Amino acid sequence: MDVFLGLSEDAIHRVVWTDELLDEWERVIIRERRRSPETAASVTAAIREFFADGRIDRNQYDHLIDEMPGKDRDDRPHMAAAIAARADALVTSNTADFPAAPLAALGLRVVGPDIYLNELLDDHPQEVIATIVRIAAEKTRPPKTPADILNALRGAGLREFPDRAQERL
């Protein structure tokens, strides 16, 4: 999450979000014990505060939800919001639940985080590396290095991007 938000802070890409998406992220991250309830709540509160311009209100996409493809009805609001926001890509680790071809016909590309970050690295190599270095420098408790940031991405399941970014450090 830090890297995606940092890239948005540095204007390398734009993060769009909904209240529903942040609420779901918070529930999942707590359930999977990847963050404490307090830490998860502080992350979503920070996104709401610092990335308020990326918020897509329910009334902007509600009318699209029933038209969205896919078996999982819980994912349809995310697709509808991305389309309403005119997002270039819907980045998810769960690409199987987001039918690529029907969404592409609606102008939305579904892509996993490893591929997406690799594309950003190809298009903006210096900026992406500078963001990773900045994020690491801002971590003080405990201190982190850029390699630590990339190792955290490996731990989150990214395979190629951390190695490619490490080569550029």
Where are these regions (language model features)?
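Active-site neighborhoods of divalent-metal-dependent phosphate/nucleic-acid chemistry enzymes
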Residues: 52-89, 143, 155-169
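Acidic, metal-binding active-site segment of PIN/NYN-like and related structure-specific nucleases
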Residues: 76-109
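General small-molecule cofactor/ligand-binding pocket signal
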Residues: 16, 57, 111
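Extended, non-globular alpha-helical segments
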Residues: 27-52, 125-134, 138-139
